[in-house]
């Protein structure tokens, strides 16, 4: 089995491509060892001690190293854990855990106004068709969280969370795109 590795715009995060599906649907972001308890693979990666984030995409796993940790030391251990997991063909999640994770919109306190339904549908469609595929190429994901008075709220996950260029991507790329196609959008914010 060959697991390819790609760099991401976030120097602390590497994207690992096992050559097979990782998630059947959706994505899953683990920001702590406690969150990772839902997945044997994520738990094993966090057990290395130098991992601060794990993200499962459709066909990749992004791993974020702790500050000051070099990938030359960490990468062989991560590859070993990934290889063992995928060769053993064990489930990605514990039986009691739900794998698919797109947080409910009201988690961040944003309740969409039903009067904005058409605008919100346009925003979600653009995010799904134009933004998420590009962000997935960089080892991350972006999730719609809400729309209020011209402001769009998005959650960055995986390699995008904590990436030095994520604010530029959000403002120069995503905000410009949404403003161009949806005139009601005045600003985009990360939550």
What is the predicted function of each stretch?
Residues 1-191:
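Domain-level signature for proteins that mediate thiol-based redox and metal-cofactor handling
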């Amino acid at each position: 089995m060959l697991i390819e590795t790609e760099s991401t715009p976030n120097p602390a995060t590497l994207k690992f491509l096992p050559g097979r599906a990782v998630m059947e649907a959706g994505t899953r972001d683990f920001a702590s060892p406690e969150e990772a308890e839902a997945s044997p693979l994520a738990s094993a990666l966090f057990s290395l001690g130098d991992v601060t984030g794990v993200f499962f995409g459709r066909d990749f796993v992004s791993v974020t190293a702790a500050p000051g940790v070099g990938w030359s030391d960490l990468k062989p251990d991560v590859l070993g854990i990934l290889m063992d997991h995928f060769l053993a063909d064990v489930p990605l999640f514990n039986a009691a855990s739900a794998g698919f994770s797109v947080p409910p919109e009201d988690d961040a306190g944003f309740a969409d106004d039903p009067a904005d339904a058409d605008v919100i549908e346009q925003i979600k469609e653009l995010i799904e068709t134009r933004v998420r595929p590009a962000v997935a190429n960089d080892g991350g994901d972006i999730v719609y969280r809400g729309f209020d008075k011209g402001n769009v709220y998005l959650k960055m996950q995986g390699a995008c969370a904590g990436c030095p260029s994520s604010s530029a991507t959000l403002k120069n790329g995503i905000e410009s795109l949404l403003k161009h196609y949806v005139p009601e959008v005045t600003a985009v914010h990360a939550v």
